[in-house]
Amino acid sequence: MYKFIDKIDPKKHDEFVEKSVYCNLLQSSSWAKVKSNWSHEIVGVYEGETLVASSLVLIKKLPLSFTMMYLPRGPIMDYDNQELVQFFFKAIRKWAKKRHCLFIKLDPGIHYSDYHLGDQRIVNEDAIRKLKVLENAKVKHQGFPLDFSSTIQPRFHMVVYANEFGEDCLTKKGAKNLKIALKKHLDTKIGYNTTYLDDFSRVMNCTENRKGISLRNKDYYKLLLDTYGQNAFLTVTYLDLDQTYHEIYERYTKCQKDIEECPENATKKLFKLEETNASLTREVKFLEEQRIKHGSKVCVCGTLTVIYGKTSEILYAGMDNDFKRYMGPYLTWYKTIEECFERGCVSSNMGGVEGTLKGGLVDFKSVFHPTINEFIGEFDLPVNKMLYSLSEMAYKLRKHKNKHK
C-alpha cells in the first residue's frame, strides 16, 4: 500500500536519488540551497517501509497568494510502474492544491534518444512507453522543442561516458589541439575550495563580455562551492607568461639574425623569414603587454563542476579570448572530465545545447566524443483547472518576453 509523505528526510532522499538511473544534480536536496529565490519541499511515496518515489519540489510564489511548482529532473521513480506513477501524481496534485498551486511543471530524466553526432537518431522505445504512462496520469506533455528558450532545462545535453573517454577517443581536431596545449607553458590546477575563485570569476567575466550575455557572479559560484563542498571543484589553467615570453623572444632574436645573414638572392627564404619575423614581433609585443597587465602568469580558462552520485555536471566554463591561440580550453575540459572519472563518476555532462546541434559550442564539445542525451521534455500537471489555461498563457508570454530581452 502506497503512502504519500510531504516531508521526506533530505538524507534519505539523496540516498534514493543517487541509486536511481535518473540520478541528477538538480534533484539533490542541496539544490534547494542554490535556488534560494524559491521555497521548497521534498515529497515522496513509501510502500511499507520502502521509499519508492521522491522529488525535490521548488515552489515559486505568484500574485494573489497563488504558487507554481517545479520538479527539476523529477520525480525520481519507476516510470514503468503505472500504478505508482498514477498514485504519485494524484497525491501531489491534492497536496499542491492545499498550497494554492496553479500547476506543477516537471521534466523527468527520461532519455528520449541517445546517439553520437553523425549517427542516426533512434527514439528509445521505453521512452515512448513511459510517455504514455505519464499521459495516463493526467500530465500534459509540452512537446519536443529544439531551442533553449522553450524549456526551463535544455532538452539536449552532450555527455561523456567513462567507457568512451581518453585521448584515443578524441576527434582528430581534439587530439591536435590538446597536443598543441600540452606543448605550451600551461599549468592546470584543480581546487575543491575557493582558492582559485577570483581567477575563475575573471575568465567568466571575459566570456560574458565576449558573448554579450549575463551569466552568474562570483557570489553564486562561491555558493555552489560551499554548498557541495568536496563534491564541487574548479579547474583552472594558467599560462606562464615569463617562460612564454623568453621562449618567443629567443626565437625572435634568432629570426632577426637569420634575416641579417640571409643572402640577397635567396628571395623565397627571405620572404618566409620576414613573415615569421612579423608574427614573432606581434607575439613579443602582445606578451610584453600581458606581463605588464597580469604579471608572471595569467589564468586563461576554467570550469566549475559538481559531482552528485555517479554523475557530474560541468556547470560553468569561461575563457580569456586574448589567449585562445594557446588552446587552453581543450586541456582544461579534458582534465576536468578526467578528474570526474577518477572520482568514480560514470558520466560527465558538458551541458545543454540547442537541438539543432549546430554552432561553436557544439563544435567544441564534439571533440570529446560525447553522447547526445535527448530528454523527453517538460510536462504540466494542472492543479487549479479553472485557472490553469490563463496561467499557462501568462507563463508562455513571460517566456517569450524573456527570450526577446
Which residues are covered by each model-predicted region?
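A general structural signal for short secondary-structure boundary/capping elements
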Residues: L102-I104, V203, L234-T237, S348-M350, ...
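Generic secondary-structure boundary/loop-capping signal
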Residues: R73, H157, E167, I376-E378
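C-terminal catalytic domain of photolyase/cryptochrome flavoproteins
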Residues: E15, K33, E41-I42, G351-K405
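Bacterial peptidoglycan biogenesis and beta-lactam-recognition machinery
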Residues: N209, F341, T371-N373
